[in-house]
């Protein structure tokens, strides 16, 4: 990158994506279920974040990521994980800008987690409840 911060970020992002794609076929057998209820009590989310081992599933940063993703689902109202419903990328969780870091998508945030934890990490399902 020769001192160019933007070039370095691009290189790291590419490395992170490559690392994630290499681990994508690994089996998910552990994880956590996280919940988030909005302060007004009318919107709630249950989200399952999967990984390969209990060791990672019990990691504080992994649990915090699951909570952040549940909060994201509450705020952004995705209808699918990766556009399985065909309603478009704007309603696909993985394609949305991550609310805690709008400069990256949820998919990019998960790729960073895969690189950090060294394990396949996926949102396996979520449900958003709303009283309205």
Which residues does each PLM region occupy?
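N-terminal assembly/interaction segments in proteins that build large macromolecular machines
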Residues: 1-132
